Swiss-Prot record:
This is D-lactate dehydrogenase. It holds the Pfam family 2-Hacid_dh_C. It comes from Staphylococcus aureus (strain Mu50 / ATCC 700699). NCBIfam families: PRK08605.1 (NF006374), PRK12480.1 (NF009127). Disulfide bonds: none annotated. The lineage of its organism: Bacteria, Bacillati, Bacillota, Bacilli, Bacillales.
Length: 330
């Protein structure tokens, strides 16, 4: 019987993974550990592996997988910047991802957390906690229908986000290297700078690559409309975090919401209760009154989890049986 290791198992995924194994006549072993130099030897007797990595995979894992006869790694996220695709290819390892598992879920998160900032919910909540129930100008908002929203990246998630904002009646500008002609309700601009210059809300939906690395830094924030709101449910490396904090502090941004953080791997998805966080930048984000931080959780719905579990396992089995899969990256 074919054997697949399901690394990075969450409690809520285990039953889904085992049920998939029964339906597909595959022996699935679940493990809470991640694929790494320390765990790769567990795969000696396996045919395939799926995992959910957040940090960079060590280079010595690829040749070890090759020596064990394993031909693939099925990543259970859309992002894949934790892998060296060229090195994997050199060792005959197919890297795959799950490019679309519930774009609407992430879009709903992006809009809902932006609305918290638009409606000044953090400020209002702090006032209520001190029993200040007054109405003041600083907590007055304006309707989204009177706003301009910039969507940076109009793939599946960005497109779904744009459609929600369109339902509010917002004016929508966008930038993408490959414009989507079906999104005829928005206006594409020739650059990110043009797309954001009049935006009240900026929503980021681009992958992590050389072009997007620190795309939003001080130079980019200099082109932002004063008082704008920034939402990042894409990848942490898209933002230069110290520059983001500075932009909020000096009033360039009214506020920001980030679901991804460049150095999140050590902390996000882990319980750090009663432990010291050594990352001063992360602490500054968490403690900032005008920055909302969530732990890479925008995708987190029952539909998305099911699709990620099955997407990873389907890709692994496809490579085992055919040598390739529809979602291969290298």
């Amino acid at each position: 019987m074919t054997k697949i290791m399901f690394f990075g198992t969450r409690d809520y995924e285990k039953e889904m993974a085992l049920n998939w194994g029964k339906k597909n006549n595959v022996e699935v072993t679940t493990s809470k550990e991640l694929l790494s130099s320390a765990t790769v030897d567990q795969l000696k007797d396996y045919d395939g592996v799926t995992t959910m990595q957040f940090g960079k995979l060590e280079n010595d894992v690829y040749p070890k997988l090759e020596s064990y006869g394993i031909k693939q790694i099925a990543q259970r996220t859309a992002g894949f910047d934790m892998y060296d695709l060229d090195l994997a290819k050199k060792h005959n390892i197919v890297i795959s991802n799950v490019p679309s598992y519930s774009p609407e879920t992430i879009a709903e998160y992006s809009v809902s957390i932006a609305l918290q900032l638009v409606r000044r919910f953090p400020d209002i909540e702090r006032r209520v906690q001190t029993h200040d129930f007054t109405w003041q100008a600083e907590i007055m908002s304006k309707p989204v229908k009177n706003m301009t929203v910039a969507i940076i990246g109009t793939g599946r998630i960005g497109a779904a986000t744009a459609k929600i904002y369109a339902g509010f009646g917002a004016t929508i500008t966008a930038y993408d290297a490959y414009p989507n002609k079906d999104l005829d309700f928005l206006t594409y601009k020739d650059s990110v700078k043009e797309a954001i210059k009049d935006a009240d809300i900026i929503s980021l939906h681009v992958p992590a690559n050389k072009e997007s690395y620190h795309l939003f830094d001080k130079a980019m924030f200099d082109h932002v409309k004063k008082g704008a709101i920034l939402v990042n449910a894409a990848r942490g490396a898209v933002i230069n975090t110290p520059d983001l904090i500075a932009a909020v502090n000096d009033g360039t941004l009214l506020g920001a919401a980030i679901d991804t953080y460049e150095n999140e791997a050590a902390y996000f998805t882990n319980d750090w209760t009663n432990k010291d966080i050594d990352d001063k930048t992360l602490l500054e984000l968490i403690e900032h009154e005008r920055i909302l931080v969530t732990p890479h959780i925008a995708f987190f719905s029952d539909e998305a989890v099911q699709n990620l579990v099955e997407g990873g396992l389907n890709a692994a089995l496809s490579v085992i049986n055919t040598g390739t899969c529809e979602t291969r990256l290298n």
